[in-house]
């Protein structure tokens, strides 16, 4: 008996070692994530109604108990980005001190903007301002001047500084640890200062990376679902193609073939080219809207709404509607913040990948300030285009969010042309977002490899499209929103820890240490010595210029 016991103990130890090795092997991040997504797809396929019930319970629990956390954490991140941009940390370069950017400013902006917003701008550009115009909260009269102010103020809030700050913070952290500290290009790298040397460091990092992969797939699948719904609506409006699940599956299928083919190529050939094309088409459509729409009105709205937004920045950032209906908050602000958080692993990883060599200040201006201004102009133009048609028209248009854009275009000259351009733009954004996500998913499931295996990119490309189809068939627009909120919650809880970890490293950065040492040396110097030093620096600059 004792021998058998010893053998059993030996077997148990071996099993434990095997399980630990399984967790520590880099490739098993891919297998574990694959298994979880496959299970979710199977559950949706076998029992849609039960899946819908479970997700509703989870959604209500998150909104009721933790809704305020979304607002506080996202505002905190926006303030952190502002501080980093304005402080001495802003001079730190994402890479070695002599690193140079790999991409031109135009290509860099095109890629980060296409990855960060994409389909959402086209989907909600008209629909959101019109919805808030018709259904404002806080006792504001529907269709009034106050409702117009509320509509644009809220749209700016949902698509401006806050979402881009979320992207910027995570991308900044990843780029800093990857290119300056030599860490892997993974979300878990942001936790290195905290977890380094701890007993379960590798296991905890693996769990974080699996959560990041799940959030990315769900977040992108949600956006692909929105894109398919609106492309289908546009084709139905222009060509009377049936607006149903079959058409949406075909659209997703065709787009999947294109973006997977693109993702299997190089970053420069695929995503960069598509991103530049996106920006060109976007500005073309924006230009047409401004010229054919109420041009002066659009610029007046932009100016006034920007002032209102900045004036009420803190107030709207923490608006919870404490004693009112929480439905509005969950359907709009919390949905958006969840969607942005769910997208951060993908967008953050991608932006980090293309931002090597830029300073922190340059990075934040490029990733937060400029895209926010473009979003403000976009919503001013498209929102004014819709609201100018009046409250009664808006009520009809927003009955189906995905068709609102095409109904509004139909009321203006060259409406069919604008609708056609919008469909092309939707498809292009659709492809670019999925293309970028496929690359990042391959990278995250390959231990941060900047050139992940093609078979992984192929599998993730197909899986995110299958999940989009499953969510649409399970509950359409509502299910897409619900899935995004639920999957983003674990990541939301991790964000404050990431803030602490980043500042912990920044304070110990060699660049900051050198600057502090120099300041201390200057403090010890006399005024004459400082004057002499200043003259010497000027002479050196003149010599360098000559």
Provide a role label for each language-model segment.
Residues 1-5, 517-546:
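Long, low-complexity, intrinsically disordered cytosolic termini of multi-pass membrane proteins
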Residues 2-147, 264, 287, 500-508, ...:
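N-terminal alpha-helical transmembrane segments of multi-pass membrane transport
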Residues 10-20, 53-59, 86-105, 130-153, ...:
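Flexible loop linkers connecting adjacent transmembrane helices
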Residues 17-22, 47-62, 81-100, 151-158, ...:
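Membrane-water interface regions at transmembrane-helix termini and the short interhelical loops
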Residues 31-46, 71-79, 239-265, 284, ...:
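Transmembrane alpha-helical segments of multi-pass small-molecule transport proteins
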Residues 68, 105, 143-151, 199-210, ...:
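Membrane-interface alpha-helices at helix entry/exit sites of multi-pass transporters
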Residues 200, 212-358, 365, 370-392, ...:
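Membrane-embedded translocation segments of transport machinery
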């Amino acid at each position: 008996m004792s021998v058998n016991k010893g053998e059993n103990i030996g077997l148990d130890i071996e099993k434990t070692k095997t399980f630990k090795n399984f967790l520590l092997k880099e490739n098993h991040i891919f297998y574990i994530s694959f298994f979880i997504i496959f299970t979710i797809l199977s559950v949706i396929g076998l029992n849609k109604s039960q899946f819908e019930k479970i997700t509703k319970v989870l959604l209500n629990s998150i909104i009721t108990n933790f809704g305020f956390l979304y607002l506080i954490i996202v505002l905190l991140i926006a303030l952190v980005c502002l501080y980093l941009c304005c402080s001495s940390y802003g001079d730190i370069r994402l890479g070695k001190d002599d690193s140079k950017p790999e991409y031109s400013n135009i290509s860099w902006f095109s890629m980060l903007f296409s990855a960060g917003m994409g389909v959402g701008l086209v989907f909600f550009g008209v629909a959101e301002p019109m919805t808030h115009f018709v259904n404002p909260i806080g006792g504001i009269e529907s269709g009034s001047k106050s409702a117009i102010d509320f509509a644009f103020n809220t749209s700016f809030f949902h698509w401006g500084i806050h979402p881009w700050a979320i992207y910027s913070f995570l991308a900044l952290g990843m780029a800093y640890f990857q290119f300056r500290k030599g860490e892997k290009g993974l979300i878990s790298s942001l936790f290195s200062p905290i977890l380094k040397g701890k007993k379960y460091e590798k296991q905890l990092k693996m769990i974080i990376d699996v959560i990041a992969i799940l959030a990315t797939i769900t977040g992108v699948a949600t956006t692909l679902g929105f894109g398919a719904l609106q492309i289908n609506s546009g084709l139905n409006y222009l060509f009377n193609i049936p607006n149903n699940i079959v058409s949406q599956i075909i659209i997703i299928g065709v787009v999947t073939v294109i973006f997977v083919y693109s993702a299997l190529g190089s970053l420069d050939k695929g995503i960069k080219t598509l991103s530049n094309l996106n920006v060109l088409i976007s500005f073309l459509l924006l230009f047409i809207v401004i010229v054919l729409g109420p041009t002066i009105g659009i610029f007046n709205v932009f100016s006034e709404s920007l002032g209102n937004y900045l004036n009420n920045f803190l107030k709207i950032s923490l608006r919870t509607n404490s004693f009112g209906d929480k439905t509005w908050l969950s359907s709009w602000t919390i949905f958006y913040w969840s969607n942005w958080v769910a997208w951060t692993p993908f967008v953050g990883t991608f932006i980090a990948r293309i931002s090597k060599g830029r300073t922190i200040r340059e990075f934040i201006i490029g990733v937060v300030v400029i895209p926010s201004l473009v979003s403000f102009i976009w919503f001013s133009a498209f929102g004014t285009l819709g609201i100018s048609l009046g409250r009664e028209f808006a009520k009809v248009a927003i009955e189906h969010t995905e068709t609102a854009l095409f109904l509004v275009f139909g009321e203006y000259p060259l409406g069919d042309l604008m609708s056609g351009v919008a469909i092309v733009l939707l498809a292009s954004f659709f492809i670019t977002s999925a293309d970028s996500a496929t690359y990042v998913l391959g990278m995250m499931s390959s231990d941060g490899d900047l050139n992940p295996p093609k078979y992984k990119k192929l599998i993730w490309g197909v899986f995110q499209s299958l999940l989009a189809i499953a969510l649409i068939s399970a509950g359409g627009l509502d299910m897409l929103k619900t899935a995004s909120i639920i999957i983003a919650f674990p990541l939301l809880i991790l964000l404050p820890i990431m803030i602490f970890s980043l500042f912990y490293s920044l304070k110990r950065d060699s660049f900051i240490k050198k600057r502090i040492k120099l300041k201390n040396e200057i403090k010890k110097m006399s005024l004459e010595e400082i004057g002499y030093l200043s003259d010497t620096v000027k002479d050196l600059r003149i010599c360098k210029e000559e």
